[in-house]
Amino acid sequence: MVAAALAFMASAQPFQSVYYPSKLTASTITRVHQRASALRSADENIHAIVRLCDEADLDRLAADYGVAFNVVTGNLATAVIPMRSLVAFAEDADVENVDAGNTVRAMTDLAREYSQVDALHGGLPDFPRSFTGKGVLIGVIDTGFDFMHPAFRDAEGNSRIIHVWDQSGRNGNTPSMGYGVVFDTPELIRSAAHDVSRDTHGTHVAAIAASSADVYKGMAPESDIVIVATDKSESGIIDALAYLLDYAEKEKKPMAINLSMGTVIGFKDGTDPIASMIDELLDKSGKKCLMAIAAGNEGHRNSTIVTEATGQGEVINTSFTPPSHMRENIFIGCSTTSAFQVTLSLVGSDGVAFETSISSDVSESVSHENITGEKDYSLVTLSPMKDADGLQRGVSINLYAPLKDGQKWKLSVTGAAGKYIACCDYGELDNGSNASTMAATACGQIPISVGAYVSRDKFTNLQGTERSSDWTVGERYPLSGMGPAFDGRDKPDVLAPGAHIISAINNYAASYNVNREDLAYTEVDALIPGRTNYWGAMCGTSMATPVVTGIMALWLQANPRLDFDHVRKLIGSPGSHIDAKTGMESLLAGVELPKSKNTVPYIYNPFTRSIVIIGEGVVCVEVFAVDGTVLKRKNRPVEPVHIPEGAMRIVRITTSTGSHILKI
């Protein structure tokens, strides 16, 4: 079957077109071309999300093609595939498609004040005790970590980063996922000092959620931190989430997970494979861990078209010019499985220089090289796309092509009745809007999607220069990704402070990843001779998301059984500003309290089997076996009281005015 109809100017030399089975998506084909042009070794691997047929034999596939499968949810699996066997693997009858996906990209001072976190840290008079994240894990999936920054040390100078998986690392212990390295002791973490990346994004994000430094303290300064330094692939994100969920289960501790990275384009209704797999993993875990995902920073771009068609005909007609790097990714999706036709044309003053078409229901993908007839290294790749349910109702386009003066791309979509979406990754569509610009990664049903509002419109940098913007404090950060989702849900779920946020900077970052003009504070390290630490300002939903993650850690400290449905009630209607104090008041009001006004409120933590007292006046906490044997007695406990293992335990909480009995 011919997947594309091609036309080009009579004066041009024929360009090269290569047809592939539709099992290889546009992004996968593009990745293959990029590695081939860079003369990369065929022994290298490609990370992808694979759709498997029903009852596929994973053991056979692994043995035949050298593929390592990691996370499997339904018919979707993350996999590490040798480049040399990629095509043969994709053509196997047990494989429906292989999608390398697009590269994920990055999406506290006043932040604490605006989100009312300081009231939780302070305890009295606002609350009967302080909430700082103690006993709670914060998992961060990101890149560019400085493990040695004082933002991540406790009062004794010990690192609060207790476990690291660097997916791109090469020297060290390999985790169960089969790639990268693990640092799981204080000595290994200290020796590594940082992940492979030369970025600073992860350091900034993690410190917003959990910094314990006196200057620019984070939301949950006494939480323990677990890091996955991602390789920036969609499959790597899924593997990271599964890894963190497994770690929390082994440690028997509640965890709040932060993802300030993602992919922009896709179905944007929760049926993109990455969004669906995130939902599936959280659901399988019993929703014991909470997760916040950045809504993205595309709210300033007219990059999306959403339209309804009532009958057969042209439903989208638009044009676009890629940014200066001449790259663009386009996604077109439909609410139904009715086939639609996509035509992409390169036009200029002298007519059509190149044209290609693809139908959403075909069984082939196609790539075109050197589309001008000259060796310009251009590459245009098109493929049909399936959603997480296996319904083929999308088309993906990846392109790179240098344009001549006056040239632009035209995109036409013809189809039957239904709702359609077209969105681009980097630039704008000429008749697009900024509605539904939030990241496809953040459109799942379960995680909390986070947008950003402005909490600071200016700051003074290290040079003494005031850096300011024309943003309005309290209003939506202009770049914050907007809803609704393609299926009509209001998104994002909540807004949090995201501009300008001052937080820790990675000492090991490459100079091109740190804008010196944005550095706002520095101090000499108290423990490491010769080291100077830095803090700087950054903006975006990447910064807003760890505010929410850290606040959820505080709420988990108060109630370790907190779930996503309850969190949504605490944060209010979609688009509300996060308010940690009001949320905690609502949370504590719903905690099971002893009926007598003479007793104090408590919380039982099932993860650690401990009683947490959240009121004053406790004289003693006693734990008994059912035969009356005293197993434990704590006078005036400050720390949580652990309940020994057993079929049933009786706990008596005695105060100066009475006592309360409970069974565990």
Residue ranges and their predicted role:
Residues 5-129, 137, 150:
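Autoinhibitory N-terminal propeptides
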Residues 124-237, 252, 256, 286-290, ...:
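Subtilisin-like serine protease catalytic core
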Residues 43-47, 326-329, 604-612:
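Short coil/turn motif common to extracellular beta-sandwich-like domains
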Residues 387-393, 415-424, 656-660:
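Short acidic/polar inter-strand loop motif in beta-rich domains
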Residues 170-185, 302-392, 396, 402-403, ...:
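Extracellular S/T/G-rich loop segment that most often corresponds to the catalytic His/Ser-adjacent loop
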Residues 34-39, 250-263, 267-270, 288-295, ...:
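C-terminal subdomain of the subtilisin-like protease fold in secreted/lumenal serine endopeptidases
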Residues 89, 330-332, 407-415, 648-656:
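Short, aromatic- and glycine-rich surface loops/edge beta-strands on solvent-exposed regions
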Residues 594-664:
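C-terminal outer-membrane/trafficking sorting elements
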